[in-house]
Amino acid sequence: VTEVRSYAAVTAAYWAFTLTDGALRMLVLLHFHRLGFSPIDLAFLFLLYEVMGIVTNLVGGWVGARYGLRLTLFTGLAVQIVALGLLSLNDPAWTLGLSVAYVMACQALSGVAKDLTKMSSKAAVKGVAAEGTLFKWVALLTGSKNALKGVGFFLGGLLLSTIGFVGALWSMAGMLAVVLVLALGTLRGDLGKAKAKVRGADLFSKTREINWLSAARVFLFASRDVWFVVGVPIFLSSRMGWDFHQVGGFMAVWVIGYGMVQAMVPRMLRGTVDAASGAKAARLWGGLLMLLPAGLAVGMQMAPSAELLIGGLLVFGVVFAVNSAVHSYLIVAYSDADKVALNVGFYYMANAVGRLGGTLLSGVVYQLAGLTATLWVSAALVALAFVFTLPLGARARTA
């Protein structure tokens, strides 16, 4: 019972964190777009957020396996509170260069916080899920997280237009402080601690399957973020004349829908019961995903419209959600119970590498060649992700 209670506490803290994470992204994007930042400037604001994700997942996975997941969770929440407080001190009178550098540093802290909290909850699920229910639990956690992140996007747009940038940051810091105090009171035990001593070398010695899967993850997430991070919100705002509410609202609906689909994937793929069937599903849905951005790019070149773009992105979201849920299940399925924090950390490090590449490409490709070009780049990245799922086997083999 304590294991399940611990897991519930970890998940609740992660949910609260996710709300602020989504809201913060919209706040920063819309607030600094309003102050006149270019698409490339905006991409740079999120750059260190993603870079820190790479480092944090790697080191955090090792710390979690060595000292337990309580430490990583509490640290994550505390760091986010500090990041929100510091960001509120940004002064519009500063020069562009100073503003970008300062916001990047605050976002770096927020990136550390996000990945410590995320890794804690993703690894905790292996300790409490009964045999045969793992896919359902992983998908439910991932799906609910994305749905809440979407609510956060909407919340960010709403807070910005009601209580302003600074008020929004302080209200979120206050909520997280309450959550941190509650988590300190409820979490006991050494959830996620490895039984054997964890060495530094364990960070990189993975099985072949985990290496292939992590490589696929890099390109899968880059394929989403190359249009999602800067391209689409700025396109809707500048080309389609949407206001903050509409952009925040659409991005929110997209991510909430994406999260709901993810949570339903185990029901859609009842045949996926182990790593072998999971690998087969990853190849099938990866092949399907490849066709979508390419088809959408052709459509947008022939007759560009907001309706086509939105319809295409919604379909992409559904198929992408299935891919992501299957990949998230496979990483836990290929892991040993006491090494799961290490493997999840390594795998989400790959996730962060993909998001970093996608974020950078999103600003650069959109500014140089427009939205259609970001869709073509997305199609190429999905093709690479698909290639890396081809060697996945029925169980993890040593590298």
Residue map of PLM features:
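C-terminal ends and interior cores of transmembrane alpha-helices
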Residues: 78-96, 287-303
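Helix-loop boundary and gating motifs at the non-cytosolic
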Residues: 2-51, 211-254
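Conserved MFS/SLC helix-loop-helix module at the cytosolic interface between two early adjacent transmembrane helices
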Residues: 55-92
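Central cavity-lining transmembrane alpha-helices of secondary-active solute carriers
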Residues: 44-62, 252-265
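Cytoplasmic helix-loop-helix junction between adjacent transmembrane helices
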Residues: 106-145
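Helix-to-loop junctions at the C-terminal end of transmembrane segments
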Residues: 56-69, 160, 261-279, 366
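C-terminal transmembrane helical hairpin of 12-TM major facilitator-type secondary transporters
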Residues: 279-327
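Hydrophobic core of transmembrane alpha-helices in multi-pass small-molecule transporters
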Residues: 15, 83, 96-116, 307-322
